[in-house]
Amino acid sequence: MTELVLNPGAVPLAEWKAIYRGASARLAESAWPVIAESAAAVQRILAKGEPVYGINTGFGKLASVRIGDADLETLQRNIVLSHAAGVGEPSPVPVIRLMMALKLASLAQGASGVRVETVRMLEEMLVEGLTPVVPCQGSVGASGDLAPLSHMAATMIGVGEIFVGGQRLPAAQALAQAGLEPLTLGPKEGLALLNGTQFSTANALAGLFEAERLFQSALVTGALSTEAAKGSDTPFDPRIHTLRRHVGQIETAAALRALMSASEIRASHLKEDERVQDPYCLRCQPQVMGAALDILRQAATTLATEANCVSDNPLIFPEADEALSGGNFHAEPVAFAADMIALAVCEIGSIAERRIAMLVDPALSGLPAFLTPKPGLNSGFMIPQVTAAALVSENKQRAYPASVDSIPTSANQEDHVSMAAHGARRLLAMVENADAVLGIELLAAAQGCDFHAPLRSSAALEAVRALTRSKVPHLSDDRHFHPDMEAANTLVRSGAVIAAVGALPGVTA
């Protein structure tokens, strides 16, 4: 397993992606003195005897309740246990590992007041593959992701459950097996662990990374569909897109043109083709997909910033021995980014479904009805297109912006919330739907190109066809379609379709 060294506040998206894909991480050695000084500042602040939110007071609406020194450890344990109130299925392990790494990098910036041993515990859990069981529902994205992060914090004090080595174990048992002792939380530490946007940000980053792969896969399946329909590559001429000026559109057009370069199928209909213009689902791919690329990059910029921030409250400033209360826990930037990703994922799937519909319609594609040599006796791709339509419509419903919703909590003390967690959690499910649509398009486009034999497509697209045919044979007569669709979906989800053609425009570099 790759082990990264995180420089708090300066971690690139590529490293967050690597952690999501399975890498481990430790903090740079330079972080530890900063952490220690922050914890020392908390002790100096306490010595002043003044009320400081979250250190010697209650929480939320109970902030006016002063807590005595003898109860400070109990206060921090209580907030963790009482706030570990999530429901639903466990969040995916890769997402929670990413959440842990995000929290680790945030705590290491010296504004949260936690002790070195507390941060070491979180680091060791990440390195040893101890992943807290975190229910997926329960956060409204302000004050931070309280419930999900509380489930993480609870495992650090030996409460709750942990995934390790494919097993789901009681936290105390999992810690003991790894040679770790449950923590006794010090002043401010419970609040520091559970206050922050790391759950929402981890889910949004996971969605971004998968959406990037989806985008690149759709460039490939879209180009193959254009070939199957004997579409023109003239709409991908760089002169058209230079005038529009949008960078994503320019890069997308260039990629599509390169994917179709030197195609025999394309050359066969350069002359004497009565069609003047292709349907929008072919002709406007650069405009639609380019806009999706641009908006994904905007979301990536926001999430790269959020991933390197401190979203705790209150914040500790050791140089002045001050604790300042603010609102960095409000995840509105993450909510907006998640909404942008959702829109892009929805549109990528939507235009892909339209290409499938075009291919199965002989009036539009010039191919046999439903891409079967014997229409009537065989139904061919009739129902796979219906499945694609169902998936796309489901994604349209899910794409409704989460950030426009809010509901007051904590007796109206927390009266405006971001809904970032909900907005980010839906992304992986949306990508899964869109992946299935692209898998269907991959099969349909490969089938369509088969009808143009012996003419061949470009070298890149022929590699994709060969890959597809290595898993799914040509459809001559109706057969059980589900296994074919699953095989194609695997080619999309694994990134094999992208690997077959080489470098494509991306989001995270």
UniProtKB/Swiss-Prot annotation:
GO CC annotations, alphabetized: cytoplasm
Pathway recorded for this protein: Amino-acid degradation; L-histidine degradation into L-glutamate; N-formimidoyl-L-glutamate from L-histidine: step 1/3
Single Gene Ontology BP annotation: L-histidine catabolic process to glutamate and formamide
One protein family per Pfam: Lyase_aromatic
InterPro entries per record: Aromatic_Lyase, Fumarase/histidase_N, HutH, L-Aspartase-like, Phe/His_NH3-lyase_AS
Location of this chain's protein in the cell: Cytoplasm
E.C. designation(s): 4.3.1.3
Family the entry assigns: Belongs to the PAL/histidase family.
Name under which the protein is recorded: Histidine ammonia-lyase
